[in-house]
């Protein structure tokens, strides 16, 4: 959080010692972040998180990068859906990239979309969680898209989330291309 220039007085108000395997503790920390930090600071912190940065998906994205290194970004984005579990990203007119992860239902929510986060699956219905939490998942996609596309990305926005819509809206993130 020092990179985000968050002062010590604010940091002291956050509980970093709580058991991170308990989703309620994580949710409390996220709520405190939302209360004390700017949206930009929250996104900057959360995009550094993300699970599943290794394994087969990592190998597949790095192989995709080698295979398509000579192609322009727009073509790479159009081909990304060929990589398993990497969705179908969309290159917006302003040069940002939007990723939608939806129509997945595993029973976490009653709507047509659900959260695939292992911690969230431990919670009992009904619940509503700040979309800031989803920055962690966005960090997962940011990592893999950077590797696959060969560009530096920054999380610009968490557009929607099933976590605060009871599954009515999908996970949707927008990334800014930095180079």
Language model features: what each stretch is:
Residues 94, 150, 168-170:
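A general secondary-structure signal for short beta-strands and their flanking turns/coil
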């Amino acid at each position: 959080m020092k990179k985000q220039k968050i002062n010590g007085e604010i940091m002291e108000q956050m509980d970093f010692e709580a058991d991170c395997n308990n989703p309620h503790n994580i949710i409390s920390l996220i709520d405190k972040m939302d209360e004390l930090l700017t949206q930009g600071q929250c996104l900057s912190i959360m995009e550094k998180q993300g699970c599943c940065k290794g394994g087969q998906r990592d190998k597949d994205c790095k192989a995709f990068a080698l295979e398509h290194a000579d192609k322009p970004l727009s073509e790479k984005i159009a081909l990304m859906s060929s990589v398993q579990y990497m969705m179908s990203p969309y290159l917006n007119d302003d040069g940002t990239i939007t990723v939608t992860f939806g129509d997945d239902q595993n029973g976490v929510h009653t709507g047509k979309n659900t959260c695939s986060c292992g911690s969230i699956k431990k919670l009992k219905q009904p619940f509503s969680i700040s979309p800031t939490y989803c920055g962690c998942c966005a960090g997962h996609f940011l990592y893999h898209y950077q590797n696959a596309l060969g560009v530096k990305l920054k999380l610009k926005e968490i557009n929607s989330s099933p976590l605060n819509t009871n599954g009515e809206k999908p996970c949707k993130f927008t990334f800014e291309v930095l180079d």
